[in-house]
């Protein structure tokens, strides 16, 4: 509803709970808010005394839409949904577009494998986490291997060993592949590892102590020494990682502000152990208070499908949380589980609240420093290439194929803070003569910039092509055909002998090549962007090529017709999951024998990589 007459408009608003959307002259949603009393809350925006941030926003508001909800909890959940849908510029916007990794234990296998895992939890077994990043997973994986010596190798590697691998030599595995440990003893290691993951270190230590005493009585001193070392390591870890006052799953959220920017850090406590932390730097309108940022951050973060159902029993914040009980009730309702939120600085969480806040401040400081560094590098590119305007966004394209097979184009995007990975795109090229790089590039550029011209995204200031003047000419022709203007076209070509540091740069509209010194910071960033486009293209190409070859090989297996092939893919949820499956898992598909399962497994792994 338009607000030409605010007084009349406000009288029409209900006094119950709901959500309001503020829209600009183009009908774009620029802010979403929740309210216990819609009339009272929206009226507050029409008072004389408003802070500068709210004044700037209200100057753009042309209409306000309201949605009535049955209760306050629904209002909070709907607000989070609308923020995710509309991405309003005056809301705090969480930029977290990656699912979280886990440690996966294949407990259904005879000798269970422990490995890194990311994605939907479809495969049978136990999942431990989530961990804040891949580094935390690998660190804990190394720790578990050191303590309990569980195998990490793939099924194909495991079943074809005739002698122990390096992991056995460095005492990170007991070599079940060649029978150096029996199933019963290995299962005991697995059970100990599960207890460790669950935070039941005391139980593990009791078991290990009993085994150490038995080994000593039987004069098996080497085995006793092994158990003694395990016990020492576990006790050392207990001192380092255990939280005073509980062994549950807790997220501790720290928040910090610097020069108008706001950063968060979450400490992840799982089964009483801190398994790592992760920083977040949401898009925050200038003038946003810490309390407002915290109130908007928490629902967005915990209601995201990327959480994959992994919600702690308790959330602890380093700053007071407005509407704490409201948010607690709404999240418990929306997540269908009991959740407690603590914001008071008292034992046993006080030291962890301080640590979370310190981590947030440090991460924010580093983030701002990196942002400033990137801004300086973009400025250096502008000066080095003598470009007329400042650069805020660069897109780079590369083409990858193997003798014309499975051609893929990549587009990577860099901004003032570095890579913008959510805007990366890859294009599977079709209908082009194999090996025709010009044709592939034209197709990718056309597909990309048709969408951008139609308003789906942001045009870059600079378009960088991995190639020479030929590729640059293709880009110029495509943009001219699409009537896209205002984009500077550049290219980076290999130098003599394809040596790094000798590359040539081209700018469309200029005849001369540009050679920058090898130590020039602008040159380093251009190389970095080109290399990232190359990496992204090669990864996509290898995946596409492997998928094609596996699909082709599946068609050649006797007993696998179109219907059974579709049945397999539907059962596992896609080719990637089928490739991950073991022979035993494939044999569980109705109508697939163990012999056929082995043939399928071999076909899936014949062309990996």
Swiss-Prot record:
> In the record, what terms sit under GO molecular function?
DNA binding; excinuclease ABC activity
GO annotations under biological process?
nucleotide-excision repair; SOS response
- Primary role: The UvrABC repair system catalyzes the recognition and processing of DNA lesions. UvrC both incises the 5' and 3' sides of the lesion. The N-terminal half is responsible for the 3' incision and the C-terminal half is responsible for the 5' incision.
Whether Nucleotidyltransferase counts among this entry's keywords is no
- Which SMART domains does the record cross-reference, listed alphabetically? GIYc, HhH1
Cite the record's note on assembly. Answer: Interacts with UvrB in an incision complex.
The text of the family note is: Belongs to the UvrC family.
Q: Which HAMAP family match?
A: UvrC
Q: GO cellular-component terms in the record?
A: cytoplasm; excinuclease repair complex
Q: What is its main location?
A: cytoplasm
* Protein name from the UniProt record: UvrABC system protein C
Q: Which Gene3D superfamilies match?
A: 5' to 3' exonuclease, C-terminal subdomain, GIY-YIG endonuclease, UVR domain, UvrC, RNAse H endonuclease domain
Q: Where in the cell is it found?
A: Cytoplasm
Q: SUPFAM superfamilies this protein is in? A: C-terminal UvrC-binding domain of UvrB (SSF46600), GIY-YIG endonuclease (SSF82771), RuvA domain 2-like (SSF47781)
Q: What keywords tag this UniProt record?
A: Cytoplasm, DNA damage, DNA excision, DNA repair, Excision nuclease, SOS response
Q: Which InterPro entries match?
A: GIY-YIG_endonuc, GIY-YIG_endonuc_sf, GIY-YIG_UvrC_Cho, Hlx-hairpin-Hlx_DNA-bd_motif, RuvA_2-like, UVR_dom, UVR_dom_sf, UvrABC_protein_C
Q: Which Pfam families does UniProt cross-reference here?
A: GIY-YIG, HHH_5, UVR, UvrC_RNaseH, UvrC_RNaseH_dom
**UVR domain location:** 202-237
Highest rank taxon of the organism: Bacteria
Domain (GIY-YIG) ranges:
15-92
């Amino acid at each position: 509803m338009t607000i030409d007459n605010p007084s009349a408009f406000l009288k029409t608003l209900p006094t119950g709970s709901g959500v309001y959307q503020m829209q600009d002259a183009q009908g774009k949603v620029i802010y979403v808010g929740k309210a216990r009393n819609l009339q009272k809350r929206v009226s507050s925006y029409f008072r004389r005394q408003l802070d500068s941030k709210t004044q700037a926003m209200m100057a753009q508001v042309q209409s306000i839409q309201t949605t009535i909800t049955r209760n306050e909890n629904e209002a909070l959940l709907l607000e989070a949904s609308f923020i995710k849908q509309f991405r309003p510029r005056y809301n705090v916007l969480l930029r977290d577009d990656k699912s979280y990794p886990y440690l996966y234990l294949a407990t259904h296998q005879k000798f269970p494998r422990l490995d890194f895992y990311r994605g939907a939890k479809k495969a049978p077994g136990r999942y431990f986490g989530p961990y804040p990043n891949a580094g935390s997973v690998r660190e804990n994986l190394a720790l578990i291997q050191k303590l309990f010596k569980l195998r990490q190798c793939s099924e194909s590697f495991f079943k074809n060993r005739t002698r122990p691998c390096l992991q056995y030599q460095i005492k990170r595995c007991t070599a079940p592949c060649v029978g150096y440990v029996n199933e019963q003893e290995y299962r005991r290691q697995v059970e100990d590892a599960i207890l460790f993951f669950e935070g039941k270190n005391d139980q593990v230590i009791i078991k290990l102590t009993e085994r150490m005493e038995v080994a000593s009585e039987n004069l098996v001193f080497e085995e006793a020494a092994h158990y003694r070392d395990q016990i020492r390591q576990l006790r050392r870890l207990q001192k380092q990682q255990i939280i005073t006052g509980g062994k549950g799953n807790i997220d501790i959220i720290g928040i910090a502000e610097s020069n108008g920017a706001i950063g968060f850090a979450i400490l992840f406590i799982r089964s009483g152990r801190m398994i790592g932390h992760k920083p977040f730097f949401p898009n925050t309108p200038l003038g946003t208070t810490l309390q407002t940022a915290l109130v908007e951050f928490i629902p967005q973060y915990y209601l995201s499908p990327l959480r994959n159902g992994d919600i702690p029993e308790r959330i602890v914040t380093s700053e007071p949380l407005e509407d704490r009980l409201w948010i607690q009730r709404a999240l418990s309702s929306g997540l269908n589980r009991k959740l407690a939120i603590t914001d008071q600085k008292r034992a046993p969480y006080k030291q962890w609240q301080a640590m979370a806040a310190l981590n947030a401040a440090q991460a924010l400081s580093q983030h701002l420093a990196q942002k400033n560094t990137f801004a300086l590098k973009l400025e250096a590119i502008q000066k080095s290439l003598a470009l007329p305007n400042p650069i805020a966004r660069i897109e780079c394209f590369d083409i990858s194929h193997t003798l014309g097979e499975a051609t893929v184009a990549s587009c990577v995007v860099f901004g003032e803070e570095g890579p913008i990975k959510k805007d990366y795109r890859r294009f599977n090229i079709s209908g082009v003569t194999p090996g025709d790089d010009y044709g592939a590039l034209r197709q990718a550029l056309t597909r990309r910039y048709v969408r951008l011209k139609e308003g789906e995204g942001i045009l870059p200031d600079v378009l960088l092509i991995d190639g020479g003047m030929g590729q640059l000419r293709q880009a110029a022709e495509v943009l001219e055909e699409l009537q896209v203007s205002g984009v500077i076209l550049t290219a980076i070509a290999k130098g003599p002998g394809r040596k790094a540091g000798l590359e040539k740069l081209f700018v469309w509209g200029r005849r001369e090549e540009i050679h920058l010194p090898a130590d020039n910071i602008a040159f380093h960033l251009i190389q970095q962007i080109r290399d990232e486009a190359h990496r992204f293209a090669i990864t996509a190409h290898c995946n596409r090529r492997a998928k094609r070859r596996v699909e082709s090989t599946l068609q050649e297996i006797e007993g696998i017709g179109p219907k059974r092939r579709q049945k397999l893919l539907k059962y596992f949820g896609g080719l990637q999951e089928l490739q991950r499956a073991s022979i035993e898992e494939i044999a569980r598909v109705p109508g697939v024998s163990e012999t056929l399962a082995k043939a399928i497994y071999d076909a899936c792994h014949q062309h990996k990589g």
